[in-house]
Amino acid sequence: MGKRKEIKDNDVEMGGTDPRVDGDESDEDMDIVNVDFEWFDPQPIDFHGLKILLRQLFDSDAQIFDMSALSDMILAQPLLGSTVKVDGNESDPYAFLTVLNLQEHKDKPVIKDLISYLQRKASSNPDLAPLSQLLSQTPVPPIGLILTERLINMPAEVVPPMYTMLMEEIAWAIQDKEPYKFSHYLIVSKNYEEVQSKLDMEDSRPQKKKKKSGDKVEKFYFHPEDEILEKHTRCFGSIEYTHKHDEGHSDSKRAFQELGIRTNGSLMLFDADKLEGAINEMKEFLQPPV
């Protein structure tokens, strides 16, 4: 498989408010730092950084999986996938994206655990029935499991180049007869919903009127690109984590807001020929304003 060239993107705006959101344009709102981002192939030096990002991706359920083994699998295919760094090749990755062939690695313990976990979670959400059916097959189909995560303050604009390079690398791998001809892609992500603060509930002050039990809970995205990607999926849905956070966890993420947040997993299944169109729309959505 041909080696991808290292690329560099200058002056990406990092931090502050999203420039696409209407609002006051005061100096207080415009906290912008220009940062040079560099894209690299996964390397052994990234091992611990990848583990940290993988734990962040799987949240409270990260303890279920052997994250060291999963990191090693990512590093074992160095010409597929990317990391994003800001302080040169020797620094820790601030973001990563890769794909793993579930069929090719089905006998490896960490992939067995992942397939079993994803199948159970998909079967618990009717919206994910097509995914549950695929993961129940023996052997599992050639599904490309896309894993991607970034530090919380990383701009979404670093994501499209990673997907673009991944699609190129997969095409090169297929030309070289490597096992990356996928029938589907499955992206693991996260979202969150707002919940009533436990601290406020214990307070004696009058409370805001609660939503009726039948009201639909609004979903928010940690990764804004997920809102675009979902439109191109065969199916998508949220999953509850097996290991629950303690009751005070949502308040610890409240940050001066009236409501806390509860995180959920998110699964997005694509027919293989639909992902490229999703990536193209995502690029347009995340294109920095002129």
From Swiss-Prot:
InterPro entries: BCP1_family (IPR025602). GO terms for cellular component: cytoplasm; nucleus. Keywords: Cytoplasm, Nucleus, Protein transport, Transport. Residues 1-11 have a biased composition (Basic and acidic residues). Disulfide bonds: none annotated. It comes from the Eukaryota. Belongs to the BCP1 family. Involved in nuclear export, actin cytoskeleton organization and vesicular transport. This is Protein bcp1. It comes from Aspergillus oryzae (strain ATCC 42149 / RIB 40) (Yellow koji mold). The gene is bcp1.
